[in-house]
Amino acid sequence: MRTIDTFSYKLGAADCFCEMVEAGVKKIALAHPCDTREERDSFHEEYEKLCQEYHVKQYDEDEGFITDLFPVSMNKDRFNVIFYQDDKVLQEYLDLKEEKKQAQATGTYTPEKRRDIAWRYGKLLSYTDEGIQRLLDQNQEKE
């Protein structure tokens, strides 16, 4: 079996995600998380080529969005890139992150609010209701 290096694997996944965003299948898509900013930034030149090819934009995510949708270790203290087309959708993502921070700061981050934020994040990622529910049910590593 042929071995694929990590850089090529992650770049190939990003290519697929950019194509899905361009086609309207996904509103936003996440690249594979990286352990360091330097690792994430090593993809920039290639990601820029993908963005040009697929007419999408990229946003460097330096503070992973932790919700019950994914295991904490997937995004905590990791660096990522978000691919998107519509600036309003990126703003919706940023607003959702801020809403979570405010809820935590004011003591209103209840189980219902946690679920609501995770659900809305899943919708931004264009997941089906069934897919969101499955991810929530399967996640055994919540904050």
What are these regions (language model features)?
Residues 115-122:
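An amphipathic, hydrophobic-aromatic interaction surface with interspersed Lys/Arg
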Residues 1-102, 106-109, 120, 129-138:
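A conserved ligand/cofactor-binding region detector
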